[in-house]
């Protein structure tokens, strides 16, 4: 049975001189790091546009890309900018945290200049093909963003009522008035696409696959909610009638109120789940594997009345279940999906996951609270993906230092037989590497032995999330050696790396044999 591993690091966390990670040289360097350490996967968070709060799970579109990730140096190479266009610009000077306000403010005029140069100089054949191939999602998105900017970035439900309800004459007038802004959004999506596809092509050539991430829900402030309200449970004015969240539990007395609109599954089923099939089809153009967030919501979901301030008054409502995934498989074949099956689990959710055949997830840091937890590695199953933690959790060291009580720490040390010289992070990484799961994914923070100062997200909080960045000197030879040793010891080497290593050994053995034979021949000649 094949065993593999990879690393979770979002694009925003790559080192960069532009205040936030990008599709530039650091991304290519990271692919090289993965390749030389025998990894098979690079897992990232959603690539979608981010809104207030900067969460990649709350996007203006289920399809459009985050233009923060467009690398400006690559635009120079393409001829659409010069380095002077951004020399001296302050994108945020902290090497370990993103300043989203500065990134948003400073990048826009630079990208506008690149767009103008592109439109003036470029051979637009590839661009026109991009527009044609992506028209179904691209044109509505560009229209939405242009009108949104016209109304000072307010969400669609705070626009003029005629624009909110898509009065035809109003929309035609706005499109004419905002033609240049629509064009800007088309072109920057093209820039995003060509840079990402080039990076993905490079990764795939190195036998590295990309694991992408798909939020189950769209944001209320999204083009989908504005353009296709019939796909959601709404009132007559197209506002959500119910919203998503999680019920109260031992950790949150009020539950979690996410506020996302909830799908009208009857309407989606009526057209054969066409929207979901299109969404996944487009996702597999971006990624090799897709992790679907909140997978249990397809079996049943927590539905909360719109306007409530907590999740207490919600109720469980049945979702489409396996019927959706049968329709997807019929159209797209055996797609590679990871089911994020964490949280409140029932036998019905487990049965749905098992029927699809998708691997679920295991989080090792959850396993040390006492008893024979399902999150302890000896209880994992092969068809699973194991983590120390994800973007929503503490780092391994952070968990040990800040959350684990003394009993949990003692249990962890005994369970992992951790010696005094082994770091907490390495012991946890060793735990998932040794597990039976077919895939182990390490977070970059855990590989670097970082604490909660490097945590990516604290759910249900705002203001200090999604900011962590890796230092430019983090990918050391020592780190590469440690990860390669871990990967080799627990038989998780990328098959391509293993084959290349074996081929190199054969070459070296052949060279050695030839050298020996030559030396023997020389000795025989001199006798």
For each feature predicted by the language model, list its residue ranges.
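Surface-exposed amphipathic alpha-helices with a cationic face
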Residues: 35, 196-206, 329, 353-354
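Structured C-terminal cap/extension of enzyme domains
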Residues: 449-502, 508-514
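Catalytic domains of carbohydrate-active enzymes, especially glycoside hydrolases
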Residues: 26-50, 286-287
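N-terminal regions that are enriched for targeting/export leaders
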Residues: 1-12, 28
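Long, low-complexity, intrinsically disordered segments
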Residues: 509-527
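Alpha-amylase-like alpha-glycosidases and glucanotransferases acting on alpha-linked glucans and related
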Residues: 10, 16, 54-189, 218-441, ...
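Conserved, well-ordered alpha-helix/loop/beta-strand core segments that scaffold catalytic motifs
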Residues: 185-218
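Short alpha-helical segments and helix-capping/turn motifs at coil-helix boundaries
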Residues: 25-32, 194-202, 276-278, 424-428, ...
């Amino acid at each position: 049975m094949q065993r593999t591993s990879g690393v979770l690091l979002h694009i925003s966390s790559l080192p960069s001189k532009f205040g936030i990670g990008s599709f530039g040289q650091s991304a290519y360097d990271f692919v090289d790091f993965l390749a030389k350490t025998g990894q098979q996967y690079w897992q990232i968070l959603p690539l979608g546009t981010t809104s207030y709060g900067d969460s990649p799970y709350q996007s203006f579109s289920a399809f459009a890309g985050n233009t923060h990730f467009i690398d400006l140096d690559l635009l120079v190479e393409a001829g659409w900018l010069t380095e002077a266009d951004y020399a001296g610009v302050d994108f945020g000077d902290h090497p370990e945290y993103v300043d989203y306000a500065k990134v948003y403010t400073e990048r826009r005029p630079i990208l506008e200049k690149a767009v103008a140069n592109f439109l003036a100089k470029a051979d637009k054949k590839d661009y026109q093909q991009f527009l044609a191939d992506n028209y179904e999602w691209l044109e509505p998105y560009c229209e939405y963003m242009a009108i949104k900017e016209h109304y000072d970035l307010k969400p669609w439900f705070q626009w003029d009522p005629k624009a909110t309800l898509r009065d035809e004459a109003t929309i035609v007038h706005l499109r004419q008035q905002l033609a240049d802004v629509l064009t800007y959004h088309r072109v920057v999506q093209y820039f995003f696409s060509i840079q990402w596809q080039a990076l993905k092509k490079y990764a795939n050539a190195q036998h590295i696959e990309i694991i992408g991430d798909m939020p189950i829900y769209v944001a209320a402030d999204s083009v989908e909610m504005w353009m296709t309200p019939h796909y959601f449970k709404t009132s007559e004015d197209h506002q959500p009638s119910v919203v998503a969240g999680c019920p109260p539990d031992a950790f949150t007395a009020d539950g979690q109120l996410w506020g996302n609109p909830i799908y009208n599954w009857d309407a989606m089923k009526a057209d054969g789940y066409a929207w979901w099939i299109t969404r996944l089809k487009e996702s597999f153009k971006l990624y090799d594997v897709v992790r679907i967030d909140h997978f249990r919501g397809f079996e049943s979901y927590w539905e909360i009345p719109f306007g409530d301030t907590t999740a207490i008054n919600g109720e469980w409502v049945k979702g489409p279940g396996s019927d959706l995934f049968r329709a997807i498989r019929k159209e797209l074949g055996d797609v590679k999906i990871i089911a994020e099956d964490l949280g409140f689990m029932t036998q019905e959710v487990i049965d749905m996951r098992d029927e699809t055949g998708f691997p679920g997830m295991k989080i090792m840091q959850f396993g040390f609270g006492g008893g024979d937890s399902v999150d302890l590695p000896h209880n994992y199953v092969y068809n699973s993906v194991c983590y120390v933690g994800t973007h929503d959790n503490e780092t391994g060291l952070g968990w040990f230092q800040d959350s684990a009580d003394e009993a949990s720490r003692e249990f962890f040390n005994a369970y992992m037989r951790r010696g005094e010289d082994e770091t907490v992070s390495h012991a946890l990484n060793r735990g998932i590497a040794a597990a039976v799961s077919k895939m182990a994914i390490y977070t970059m923070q855990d590989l670097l032995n970082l604490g909660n100062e490097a945590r990516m997200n604290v759910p249900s909080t705002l203001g200090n999330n999604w900011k962590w960045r890796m230092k430019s000197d983090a990918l050391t030879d020592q780190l590469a050696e440690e990860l390669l040793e871990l990967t080799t010891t627990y038989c998780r080497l990328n098959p391509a790396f293993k084959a290349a290593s074996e081929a190199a050994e054969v070459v070296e053995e052949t060279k050695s044999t030839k050298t020996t034979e030559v030396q023997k021949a020389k000795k025989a000649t001199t006798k």
